[in-house]
Amino acid sequence: MDTKAFKRSLQQSNNYHRKGFGHETEVMGTMNTEYQSSLIQKIRENNYQWQEGDVTIKLAEAFGFCWGVERAVAMAYETRQHFPQEKIWITNEIIHNPSVNQRLLEMNVGFIEVINGSKDFSVVEAGDVVILPAFGASVTEMQLLNDKGCTIVDTTCPWVSKVWNSVEKHKKKDYTSIIHGKYKHEETVATSSFAGTYLVVLNLKEAQYVCDYILNGGNKDEFLEKFKNAHSEGFDPDKDLIRLGIANQTTMLKSETEQIGKLFETTMLKKYGPTELNEHFMSFNTICDATQERQDAMLNLVEEEVDVMVVIGGFNSSNTTHLQEISIEKGIDSYHIDSDKRILPGNKIEHKPLEKDIETKENWLPDGKIIVGVTSGASTPDKVVEAVIERIFEEKNAGVLV
């Protein structure tokens, strides 16, 4: 399928909307009321620090809602206002934040249910309005919704669209797209649908395995079993690793994406030499600015004096998880929570360790005066960050801890 031609045709349709509906001013007023925080603004203006009693909060200098997320949420609000009576669906969570998604449910926006691993689009009828989330949607989903005669509101982040353009360039020149990402993540599912031949690698370890195969060969069956859910149909590592292009899920760890790109470039250089490199390797910078800014701010924060780190964001948020990784790698006691309700009375906290289920930690706040580092993922409103900080102050300064 010519995905580029389909996308162009869809964008020219009267049923396709990507620029809102002219209600920006009113919607931004509503969003400011629901999601902004006067306390967080004060902390920003106070050099990202705030003290109450025995607690000093240090905020990362870049955190929370990014432009792409704010744009997606605003478009969803505009859609409800512009279509007050129509049935509105969204193909997935608008962003990975439970409070924002709950707000959309309260606005009578339906979420497409997943049944036996597949989305049930049978509930969508002609004339319904369907929102595509910030992560985007697969070509198959867009085609299905277009064929049904739905009004499509596309809130896909432009940074994600940039990655799609990159893999389409790979496809046009018969390059295999090496996608650094999580093969089940909505964004990577969408990106791979625009690619031709592709392989998804999760991390540097998997990338090294692929590069070793390129240089030394190996067991094809073992390779295909290792990546059984992470490649295009009919993928053959003996034929499809000769010309490679690099792309990434925009929320992955920036430093690892760069390392993976460099590793593949070096591998192809060894395999084919400098004069042939450009015939076998291509790379475009598709690292999201907002992801990079938040990770850089976290790298700075972990170098400061911090007793405990709190990372706020949806548990299924990839960019939030990578912020957590930065803190853990520095050896800081770090707690990933999705709301203030995870901070329990009696100095307890429900949190999600990396690659584990939610667990409860007792005595998580140390005795005496403490410095708590705080950051949040790109899908987390300031209001949620404020609520978490207020709970920390409440627990620590209310005489609960001695």
Curated annotation (Swiss-Prot):
Alphabetical keyword list: 4Fe-4S, Iron, Iron-sulfur, Isoprene biosynthesis, Metal-binding, Oxidoreductase
Pathway info: Isoprenoid biosynthesis; dimethylallyl diphosphate biosynthesis; dimethylallyl diphosphate from (2E)-4-hydroxy-3-methylbutenyl diphosphate: step 1/1; Isoprenoid biosynthesis; isopentenyl diphosphate biosynthesis via DXP pathway; isopentenyl diphosphate from 1-deoxy-D-xylulose 5-phosphate: step 6/6
GO biological process: dimethylallyl diphosphate biosynthetic process; isopentenyl diphosphate biosynthetic process, methylerythritol 4-phosphate pathway; terpenoid biosynthetic process
Binding positions for (2E)-4-hydroxy-3-methylbut-2-enyl diphosphate per the UniProt entry: H96, H185, T250, S317, S318, N319, S379
Annotated active site: E187
Residue numbers binding dimethylallyl diphosphate: H96, H185, S317, S318, N319, S379
A GO term for molecular function: 4 iron, 4 sulfur cluster binding
Protein residues bound to isopentenyl diphosphate: H96, H185, S317, S318, N319, S379
Recorded catalytic activity of this chain's protein: isopentenyl diphosphate + 2 oxidized [2Fe-2S]-[ferredoxin] + H2O = (2E)-4-hydroxy-3-methylbut-2-enyl diphosphate + 2 reduced [2Fe-2S]-[ferredoxin] + 2 H(+); dimethylallyl diphosphate + 2 oxidized [2Fe-2S]-[ferredoxin] + H2O = (2E)-4-hydroxy-3-methylbut-2-enyl diphosphate + 2 reduced [2Fe-2S]-[ferredoxin] + 2 H(+)
CDD domains (alphabetical): lytB_ispH
UniProt entry tagged with the keyword Iron: yes
Cofactor remark from the record: Binds 1 [4Fe-4S] cluster per subunit.
Keyword hit for Secreted: no
Function text: Catalyzes the conversion of 1-hydroxy-2-methyl-2-(E)-butenyl 4-diphosphate (HMBPP) into a mixture of isopentenyl diphosphate (IPP) and dimethylallyl diphosphate (DMAPP). Acts in the terminal step of the DOXP/MEP pathway for isoprenoid precursor biosynthesis.
HAMAP family: IspH
Protein name: 4-hydroxy-3-methylbut-2-enyl diphosphate reductase
Organism: Crocosphaera subtropica (strain ATCC 51142 / BH68)
Gene name of the record: ispH
